[in-house]
Amino acid sequence: MESQQLSQHSPISHGSACASVTSKEVHTNQDPLDVSASKTEECEKASTKANSQQTTTPASSAVPENPHHASPQPASVPPPQNGPYPQQCMMTQNQANPSGWSFYGHPSMIPYTPYQMSPMYFPPGPQSQFPQYPSSVGTPLSTPSPESGNTFTDSSSADSDMTSTKKYVRPPPMLTSPNDFPNWVKTYIKFLQNSNLGGIIPTVNGKPVRQITDDELTFLYNTFQIFAPSQFLPTWVKDILSVDYTDIMKILSKSIEKMQSDTQEANDIVTLANLQYNGSTPADAFETKVTNIIDRLNNNGIHINNKVACQLIMRGLSGEYKFLRYTRHRHLNMTVAELFLDIHAIYEEQQGSRNSKPNYRRNLSDEKNDSRSYTNTTKPKVIARNPQKTNNSKSKTARAHNVSTSNNSPSTDNDSISKSTTEPIQLNNKHDLHLRPGTY
């Protein structure tokens, strides 16, 4: 009986099962595969306990405290019930969580370099990466957002979260430096506009078009704290958040004011560098324009001293004002006020000379009348020349006949003949010609 059992449990039939038995167990008569049920249950309990300890072990790294945000846990954004923007344009809980890729599709399909987020917004456990726009690539506001034609058909979770419109909003880049905040806030405002939240953005006067709702304020706060870590915020932004950590609207309003101020500064600098004056406009208006530009720049921290201002003004002078460039004896200590005194003096001299100069120019109407009268008077003269010629020709014939008859007549006085022949014949023509009898 034992031989049959040994033949059944031979190494040939059992292979690796018998090979794993130690040499100590081979000398015993106990079957190596005969394991009691109690030992099996103990092993199962031990393995279950080990697995439970691994899953419940807390993370080794503690989450640092965030002094400017409400909670380091991932933001929970309740979906709006009757919000002004559609459901697909608002982040859900998975979309606001950096570990959820359902809104953007698979990470490998994102055409941007992934970036590890700051741990202050990460919950303990497995973490994933979030897209970042590197500084070398940049995201200009003129670049259209990939809201259309960028569908991810391979992701089933994206289909469940989005509607049939298949529109995706491009997220803003991660803020990585306080100096990059002015450029970052431009992309964040663009992100809000693409999410149908342009009405809550403050306008030029600092007021939004409509009132923000509670759901929109939650969305605004959550997205701001995700994409703008507190350690990279400027000092003035931290001061606002220290008073009210949810006052994102005030941050946006101050940012827009700074953008307008920067734009005005750039325009003033360009205008001051391209000044042109030749006396065509009043000197008072030119002085007011220049002094206002200099005052605005000085108030915004861009100081323009008298030397630089005078050089910029004199470089744009032309005409009679151009010689002010060569007044070297006053260039060192000349002020803007002194330079404008010289400009006013030249302008007043120009105006006085223009007012005192007599006007010798004839009126155009008089010239037209003279030309018309000249044509009218010359016309009858041309017409009257023909009858004069005929009368002269007749008189010539008559005089010649009289001379010939007088020569034949014996009673004619020779002295009178010679006197008449030497007398010039007066012709009534235009050129006033004097013809003698021998010439015709």
From Swiss-Prot:
Record's compositionally biased regions (Basic and acidic residues): 429-440
Oligomer status and interactors: Homotrimer.
Native source species: Saccharomyces cerevisiae (strain ATCC 204508 / S288c)
InterPro entries named among the record's database cross-references: TYA (IPR015820)
Biased composition (Low complexity): 153-165, 402-418
Name of this chain's protein: Transposon Ty1-DR6 Gag polyprotein
This protein's domain notes: The C-terminal RNA-binding region of CA is sufficient for all its nucleocapsid-like chaperone activities.
The keyword Cytoplasm belongs to this UniProt entry's keyword annotation: yes
Further details from the record: Retrotransposons are mobile genetic entities that are able to replicate via an RNA intermediate and a reverse transcription step. In contrast to retroviruses, retrotransposons are non-infectious, lack an envelope and remain intracellular. Ty1 retrotransposons belong to the copia elements (pseudoviridae).
Region annotated Disordered, chain positions: 1-93, 126-174, 352-440
Sequence positions bearing Phosphoserine: 416
Gene assigned in the entry: TY1A-DR6
Keywords, sorted A to Z: Cytoplasm, Phosphoprotein, RNA-binding, Transposable element
GO molecular function: RNA binding
